[in-house]
Every structure is written in structure tokens, then in C-alpha cells.
Amino acid sequence: MSKYTILDKINTPSDLKLIPESQLKILSAELRAFLVDTLDVSGGHFASSLGATELTVALHYVYNAPYDNIVWDVGHQTYIHKILTGRKDKLVTIKKDGGISGFPKRSESEYDTFGVGHSSTSISAALGMAIADRLQGKSSNTVAVIGDGAITGGMAFEALNHAGGIKEDILVILNDNEMSISDNVGGLSAHFSKIISGGFYNSIREKGKEVLKNIPPIFEFVKKIETQTKGMFVPANFFEDLGFYYVGPIDGHDVTELVKTLRILKDHKGPKLLHVITKKGKGYTKAESDPIKFHHVAPSFHSGENITTKISKPTYSNIFGDWICQKAAKDKRLVGITPAMKEGSDLIRFSQLYPHRYFDVAIAEQHAVTFAGGLACQGLKPVVAIYSTFLQRAYDQVIHDIALQNLDVLYAVDRAGLVGADGATHDGSFDLAFMRCIPNHVIMTPSDENETYHMLEFGYEYNGPAMVRYPRGAGIGAEITGSLDLELGKAKIVKQGSKIAILNFGTLLPLAKQLAEKYHATVIDMRFVKPLDKIMLDKVSQTHEIILTLEENCIAGGAGSAVNEYFVAKDLSNKIIVRNFGLQDKFLNHGTKDLLLAQSKLCVENISKELDKLI
């Protein structure tokens, strides 16, 4: 007999609605157990979904998705949503080749109303949907679910301001699992929340307002008293000042209370914000104790089977983490900045050693960059540790606030290139293209750990904005040397060959070497995308017939395009054959990195096919 007596009956939200409300608590427990069992096989985002279990159940129990729009932010917390919307049996394939995505994806399910992966987008998207439905005469409801981390993003506040200003009928649910506000979740607060979310209170409140509006002094006095009283327990003032009807905070693990509150709010028109308190990792003791560690789990995390203790090579993030700590010890001007990526960027040790020089600005990439500019103006040396995919969000600041003023800011760009299982929303496919066109920038593409370390040093000492891009995961095991012969805009010949020259930008150097062995080709580690080594390009164009460029970046506008532009300007494009190899002009699905590289023709087999046609 299955241990999922209720869950086995559910494949869609319609099935869920047939379950008696009294059994929703049991269902929530079964969902957690199913999540543990499944991710023990597949791995995936864990703690966030555990924390949002009851909220997800309540939403699909009360609302009629997909007719009603439920919009999720980021997507880490949506595994329960996927289970309840026809993907229960596919969850074991999550983030695998040919499996379902780790994030909501419109092409995957009609219940995934908006594709996400980046933060703070839900309220904007939900507002657009609500207005579109209203303009087309559709009587649907729209809900945005956003976490206390994601709501720190400026885009979320822009959307709140817009929605509140136009009084659009939309519900924003703030899923708050931040422990620092736990003191607010007490008897008085819970009692007050029940009162203000009740239909009787709402009715009296609104009718009373209509009467008192005819007596302005009394109306303003009562409104002020109500706001101040609520403000003693909840952060109502801010949201109500934006035009939202605020309810909460309520217990996000009391599924009965959630269902009751959502039903009431469903009938309350206008912009509403429901503040729910949840615990990340709820129901799994280890995840509750260490939600960061259990944010994402590997297969066998629960059973302990097949877990090895082999020592792996340091990741590129580890190389950065070592460098910044060592540099900070020597230079008190160094300041480290991250937009909510302390763990991922390996800034934990730096934050502990230099807490007054470490700034986690939350999910605020635009602010992070301009903040760095302000620090640089006053003589400090800011280092912005940021993922390639998130650097996109600060593009205007990179141009207007840093490059235009030629400020000393170093961008340590992590997760450059393909990231594998997280898919297109997190791939760092575009940074070379969108950064290369900006004046005053130095752009470096290290080929291994040693070059990464020394290019970070070079970029830090450079007088102006500089960028070092490096991929996710471990390198080749290159030893960090005491020094490296590194000169601005100068490439390095790795292997001398003939006829064919391979210009490598970044960590595809092992691939370049494999091709060189097969074709007796010259291999050049270009190191710099900006400035390019033009002397080297002139030499190569005079001594070789075929030139290949390799990069883990989009071909359009990337490093290879920079080489093409130079050869065209020198009127050499008709005298040599140039072929660019990089990421294709399409978004890739999630999968193993080797598979995705092969799909992008970045492998010996595919490049050989092209070369054989040219020789």
C-alpha cells in the first residue's frame, strides 16, 4: 500500500478541490514526504519548497488555475506547485536532460503562467496579466507570490507603486521566512490578523469609511489611529501608503487559516497584500536548522547512499574567494560587494574576516554597481562579485555610472558561460557581447585557475573598470603560481602549429589543445577580449590560412566578432578563412554541461566536421 493515500488521488488542481478541507494538513505532510523521497533520487531545490507547501496547497485549493493567474517569483519554491499541476511523476527528472525545468516555464505547463529564474519579477508580470484580463473582459483573479528576499529588488517596489497607484485588483502574497521578524508572530499579532482578515471587520471597516468621509476631521483621526495600531504589530504602514490593503502576518503553515484568508481576499477588490510567515525547510529538521545548506540538495542527501568523500578540485569561485581574502589583507582599500550571492560567490570567509568591508546589498544589482562607483570616487577599491546572468540587470549603471566616469571597479563575473542544470535563465551567455561595446573597459577571459587568480589581481590594480569572467564549477587543477607574465592586451602562444590557428578565449583551452593535436594547429590563449592583441592577430593572419575562435559566449557580438571586426577593418577578410565557434543564437534547455556544449558545436567532433570541409 502506498504511503501517499491522499496524494495518489491528485494529479491536477481539480483533483485537489475534491479533497475535504479537513485533510489538507495530512496532504501537506504527504507532499513533504514525497518531495524528500523524490529529491533523494534526483536532487534539486529543497528548503524553499518545503517552506511553501501549505501556501501552495491553499492557493490551488482556493483559486481556479490556470483560469486564475498564479505568478511565482524566482521559482525555487515551486516544486510543490509542479507536483499538484500534473508533473508529479516527472519530478524525478527535474533539471535533467529531457526532464522538467527547475523553474516555472510557460512552454512546460499551462499552470506556469510566467517563466522565471531571476528575482523580483512576479508583481510586474502579475499586474500586466490582471490588466490584460480586465481589458479583455475576463473575470479572473491574479496572485503574485514573492519572498522576503525577492521583494528587496527595486523592480518589485516599482510594481507595488504602480499597482497601488492605479488600484488594480491583484493579490500579492509576501512569503516571509526571515527569522529576524519572528518576534512579530505572537499572540496579539495572530489575533489582530484574524480580526482584520475577517469578512465582518472588512465590511464594517469599509462602510465606516464611507460614512466618516463626510466628516473629514474624524475620518482622518480614525484612519490615523487604525494605521498606528496596526503598525505596533505589523509593517502595514508602508504597504498601505502604497495603496494596498494589508493583511497579516499570518501563519504560513496553518493551511486552514490560509484557505480561509484567501477566500476572503478573493472577494475583496483592489490591490491587496497578504503577509505570511513561513519557515524555510519546514518539516525536515536538518533543513530547518540550516536552510542555506539545504537550499539545494544533491541525490542521496537523505538516504546517504552513494555519497563519496573524495576531495574535488577547487571551483573558480573558490579561487576568487581565496584571492579576495588575500588581497584584502594587503590592501585596506578593498571593499567586497555582492547582490545576495555570498555563498555562491564564495564570500563567506571574506565576510567573516572583514565584516566592515563586506556589503551584501540584497537583490539589487543596479544599486550594487552604482554603490561601487560611489566607493571608488572616494578612493576605495570596490570588487563587485556578481553572476554573469545578473550583471545584465545593471547594464545602465555599468555604462553611465562606472564606464563613463572611468572609475576603478573590478567585476568578478562568476557563472560565465553555460551553467548546466539551471538552464537558460541562469546561463552567462551574453556578458562578452554586452560589455565589449562599452568604452574604458578591460575584459579578461582566463583559461584556468592560475590565470583567474592573476587576472583578478591585474584587474584590481588596473586604473579603470575591469572585468574577469570565469565559469561555474571546478577547473582543470592548475596550480596557483607566485606570479604570471601578464601584460595588458597581450596573448600567449600555447602551441605552435601551422596552417590552422585556434584563438581561445576562456576555459575552452583543453578543447583547443585537443583540436591542435588532431590538426597540428597553433593554439593561442588570447586572455584579453578588450583590448585585443592586434599584433598577434596581424602575425597569425600572415602565417596561417584558417583561423578559429573559441568562446563560451554567444557568437553574435562576442570575442569572435571582435576578431572579425579587426580583420574586416584591416581588409583581411578575403585573404584568410575565419570561423567563430561559441554559443548559438538560441536559448538552450537545461542539461549537463557537456551535452549543452555539444549542442553548441563546442566539441571536437562538431568542430572537426567544420574544419574538414575547409581543409
Curated annotation (Swiss-Prot):
Entry protein name: 1-deoxy-D-xylulose-5-phosphate synthase
Highest taxon of the lineage: Bacteria
Cofactor note: Binds 1 Mg(2+) ion per subunit. Binds 1 thiamine pyrophosphate per subunit.
Any GO MF annotation of the entry: magnesium ion binding
Source organism per UniProt: Francisella tularensis subsp. holarctica (strain LVS)
Record-linked SMART domains: Transket_pyr
Catalysed reactions, as listed in the record: D-glyceraldehyde 3-phosphate + pyruvate + H(+) = 1-deoxy-D-xylulose 5-phosphate + CO2
Pathway the protein contributes to: Metabolic intermediate biosynthesis; 1-deoxy-D-xylulose 5-phosphate biosynthesis; 1-deoxy-D-xylulose 5-phosphate from D-glyceraldehyde 3-phosphate and pyruvate: step 1/1
Keyword tags: Isoprene biosynthesis, Magnesium, Metal-binding, Thiamine biosynthesis, Thiamine pyrophosphate, Transferase
Cofactor(s) required for function per UniProt: Mg(2+); thiamine diphosphate
Gene name linked to the record: dxs
GO terms under cellular component: cytosol
